[in-house]
């Protein structure tokens, strides 16, 4: 019977670790597109912020120029300790141009080229929140020694796939990255002790993709037409085969939020050195 690696105990442990934050009166600046459907995520951030006595300063923008201006203003404001660009934004906007304007020491998403470069060199404190959550879950439940393990990351985004690859490699796992052009994915994934899937497609990973006793981390969050939230894994059919699996909802997402506030604390420490 598979171990269900729920996110709440992991997130609670991180919040406990972050209790020193409560006396610091930190502020997280959030910039979102006016009218976007990010309300649910913002609500989760708000609850976590209250728990840690963090103030949220939310700016809503309608034009790309407003976005870049808001980033610059918050970047110069000493009372703002971290900046988060809350997706989604219009597809035609140059998101990377805007995110690159965030000072590296205020980059709670850890996607600035400076922070990703340091991560690649193995000397970065800031790690993108979602892959940081993946490692936190694996460490908390301790179901698989990463050293020497065969790991497959499905998805190569700079927010999840790339940093997950770097972190797992630095933990001495043997890591392969798969993507939309990968040939014969099932035969590749059936060799993996650990599968991390982040493709944004409901029920993408089936029982044909996993070997018996593997560990599966489902990063996906997909809303079906009937409103049901599911992951990238066909959990009903995969779960009976594997040693451990994260649920959706209730898995990686809540830990990602906690890791975001951990990054805010690290940003503050960087700014006050």
Curated annotation (Swiss-Prot):
The family this protein is said to belong to: Belongs to the tetrahydrofolate dehydrogenase/cyclohydrolase family.
Keywords per UniProt: Amino-acid biosynthesis, Histidine biosynthesis, Hydrolase, Methionine biosynthesis, Multifunctional enzyme, NADP, One-carbon metabolism, Oxidoreductase, Purine biosynthesis
Pfam families: THF_DHG_CYH, THF_DHG_CYH_C
Protein name per Swiss-Prot or TrEMBL: Bifunctional protein FolD
Residues involved in NADP(+) binding: 155-157, 180, 221
Natural source organism: Coprothermobacter proteolyticus (strain ATCC 35245 / DSM 5265 / OCM 4 / BT)
GO molecular function: methenyltetrahydrofolate cyclohydrolase activity; methylenetetrahydrofolate dehydrogenase (NADP+) activity
One GO BP: purine nucleotide biosynthetic process
CDD domains, A to Z: NAD_bind_m-THF_DH_Cyclohyd (cd01080)
Subunit-structure text: Homodimer.
Source species, domain of life: Bacteria
GO cellular component: cytosol
Function: Catalyzes the oxidation of 5,10-methylenetetrahydrofolate to 5,10-methenyltetrahydrofolate and then the hydrolysis of 5,10-methenyltetrahydrofolate to 10-formyltetrahydrofolate.
Pathway connected to this protein: One-carbon metabolism; tetrahydrofolate interconversion
EC number: 1.5.1.5, 3.5.4.9
Catalytic activity: (6R)-5,10-methylene-5,6,7,8-tetrahydrofolate + NADP(+) = (6R)-5,10-methenyltetrahydrofolate + NADPH; (6R)-5,10-methenyltetrahydrofolate + H2O = (6R)-10-formyltetrahydrofolate + H(+)
Keyword match Hydrolase: yes
């Amino acid at each position: 019977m598979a171990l269900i690696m729920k996110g709440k105990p992991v997130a609670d442990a991180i919040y406990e670790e972050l209790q020193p934050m409560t006396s610091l009166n930190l502020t997280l600046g959030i910039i979102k597109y006016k009218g976007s459907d990010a309300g649910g995520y913002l609500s989760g951030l708000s609850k976590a912020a209250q728990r840690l006595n963090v103030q949220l300063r939310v700016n809503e923008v309608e034009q790309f120029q407003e976005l870049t201006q808001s980033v610059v203003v918050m970047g110069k404001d000493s009372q703002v300790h971290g900046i988060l660009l809350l997706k989604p934004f219009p597809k035609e906007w140059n998101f990377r141009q805007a995110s690159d304007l965030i000072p590296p020491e205020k980059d709670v998403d850890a996607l600035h080229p400076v922070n990703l470069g340091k991560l690649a060199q193995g000397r970065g404190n800031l790690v993108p929140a979602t892959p940081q959550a993946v490692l936190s879950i694996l460490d908390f439940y301790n179901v698989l020694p990463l050293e020497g393990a065969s790991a497959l990351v499905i998805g190569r985004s700079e927010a999840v796939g790339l940093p997950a690859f770097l972190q797992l490699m630095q933990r001495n796992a043997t890591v392969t990255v798969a993507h939309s052009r990968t040939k014969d994915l099932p035969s590749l994934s059936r060799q993996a002790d650990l599968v991390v899937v982040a493709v944004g497609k409901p029920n993408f990973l089936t029982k044909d993709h996993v070997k018996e006793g593997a560990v599966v981390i489902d990063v996906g969050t997909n809303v079906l037409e009937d409103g049901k939230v599911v992951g990238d894994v066909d959990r009903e059919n995969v779960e009976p085969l594997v040693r451990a699996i994260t649920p959706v909802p209730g898995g990686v997402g809540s830990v990602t939020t906690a890791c975001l506030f951990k990054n805010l604390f690290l940003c503050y420490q960087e700014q006050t050195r």
